Amino acid sequence: MGLTPLNPNGLWLGLDTGGTFTDAVLLADGRRVVASDKALTTHWNLAIGIGAAIRAVLAALPAGMRRDAISLVSVSTTLATNAVVENRFAAVCTLVIGFDAAMVARSGLERDGGIVVRIGGGHDATGEALMALDEAGVLEAVREHGARVEAFAVAASFSVRNPSHELRARALIRGVSPLPVTCAHELSSKLDAPRRALTATLNARLTPQIRHLIEALGRVLREESINAPLMIVKGDGSLMKAEVALEYPVETILSGPAASVVGAGFLTGLTDFVVSDIGGTTTDVAVVSGGRPVISAEGALVGGWRTMVEAIDVRTCGLGGDSEVLLDRQWRLRAGPRKAMPLSLLAHSFPGVLETLKAIATQDRLPDFPTLFAYRNPERELPPHRSALEGRLWAALTLAPRAVSAVVRNASGLAALRRLADAGLATIAAFTPSDAMHVLGRQQGWNREAAECGARILATEERNGTAARTTASPEEICERTYELVVSESARALLAATLAQDPGIESSAERRDSLGTRLIEAAIAGRRLSSIAHATLGLDRALVAIGAPAGAYYPEVARRLGAPLSVPEHAPVCNAVGAVAGVVAQAVAILV
């Protein structure tokens, strides 16, 4: 792989579009941060949040610096990572050519109801055709599924030896449909057709989201008269042109975590460290040795999907500051992997919702889904292919938040509402760790009273569901939520560090009784007995970044016995990393 250092002259604008915030930084001479700011990410129209962040950072430019000195714009994003972790995708039809049933099963393509159509054709290991491509079958698949999907993916057996059937299928699809088409052979030259098909499917599923992002970026840059090349961070930390990202959005899986690794090294000057990036939706952990992150030899693993995308070896878990906190069937607090709008932010944005929250919080007999609220996202219309139940829910929602109990009657209705949210049509709000931090006084900026109502509702719900019939205080609920985030963050860090040495597994994977007890006691900060305790120790610095890092990681580091570094620009570290990278191009030739 050839690495080309970026021209350090002038100003570089770094952006990071995350699940909750869009961050912006300006670097001067490739060395120092001269301005930074952030704005809420507006998922229904990304241009609003991006524009707000860019205008804020430009307004903070020091005297004597001008926007026309910006010579590079580079963007990292967690949109693809979050979509994979939350299983929130565009609907896709995958055509698999020359696959048998076992290959389809091994690919996992039918997981979560994916549309897969087997087509006759394919090649052998020498590139010879096994049979002619079933062109009529391709066209029939488009006719049957084209109206209810947003993209197509095509994967043929041994297409890395002979891609002609994939190319012909794409031409046929484009002849009758305007939808984007991904060919598997263009994403990886490695063998393993089922995994190549999965990677192509993920690429197709992510195409609408990345197009939305890049189009929004283009509009804002034109409005702000910024004329500079636009680059996107890849999962290995290098940069690619925006035009390339439009064709291969799956390359942006782990874009945000990769930028966080680059930014952490840039801001701290460390060469050997463990970095943990806690955002609104996920926590991402990576190990850096000798100034270079470890690259996953097997491809990026995110949300249980093993792709063929070259990326930094990152452990991603669905836990962040805005993870949805609910009680499970055993009436235990659980956080994630779904993200929700914090109740404190909901009431900050829609003050009228506070009275509804107060009314629910004073009830002994709670409605179903008592902490959940939902509203329509602006500027969105319901597509015609949505189900009848989704249509009824859409009609019941408004641009102002409503209690979910007022529009949803059962679990099926809640699942349909979540599908609307997954499609970007609606927003769901719930109690989150960010709310807990507001109640505990460790975070400010939004509506603390709304957060306290959410905690009180959870306490009542817990009392009603358990035999003890005792009610925890809102502060106790919030302290337990804090403990959830701390302990799960510590587990993610421990798993990532143990995985660096072959043969060493985390206690969660081994389930060894003594090992589990020792490690869990250390993570939880509790004694083993009256005369014994367990401690852990990391031999490298722990660099904690992300907006919530300062609230949780002093305690995480203490429990892991790690020296902690929270750098000066930790809340916008990803945006720093977006412009502190390199342009890279790799070429592989089969002889």
Tell me what each language-model feature is:
Residues 2-591:
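N-terminally biased helix-coil "hinge/interface" segments that flank
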